[in-house]
Structure formats: structure tokens, C-alpha cells
Amino acid sequence: MRYNDLIFLNLFRNYKDEFAGVGRRDFVIYLEELVKAGEYGIALEDFLVQMYEYDLEISSNDLTIIKNLCEGVNIDSNLWLVLSIKATGD
């Protein structure tokens, strides 16, 4: 299934500065390349794992988007549920 690349790209780009702040300047570029190759699940999973590993806060609006994307690409809810604990209000 082909998804709207912009949904993924905009989500990842929202956190470009946060990743740069933890020394992962090229991480969003890596995610963009995965999306352009149609590897939505891998990109989203890597994004979620790195958000957790670096203890980055996620907005509640983005968390809703992530939940829907995870359901669409069959990613285990445990990956995004962990982030929901520390989601920030918008």
C-alpha cells in the first residue's frame, strides 16, 4: 500500500531540531530516504525507537497521527504507547 509521503515527511521534519540537539543531525534525512523508497514501516519504527531512546517529547497532536500511521502499517502499539506517557500538550 502506498501512503501519502507528506504525512510521514512532515511528521519527521517536526523533530529535526530535536534530533540535531542530540547529535543526530542526519537522522531525518535517513528517514526521508526510507519514505521515498516506500519503507514506511521501517521509517516510522526507527523514528519511534529514536524518540524513545533520546527521551524526546512528542506533541499530543503528533501522537494521534503516529497512532493512526502505526495502525496502518501494522506496527505494534507498544512502540507508540510508550511515547504517549510523556506527550506534551499542544
Residue ranges and their predicted role:
Residues 1-90:
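C-terminal-biased regions
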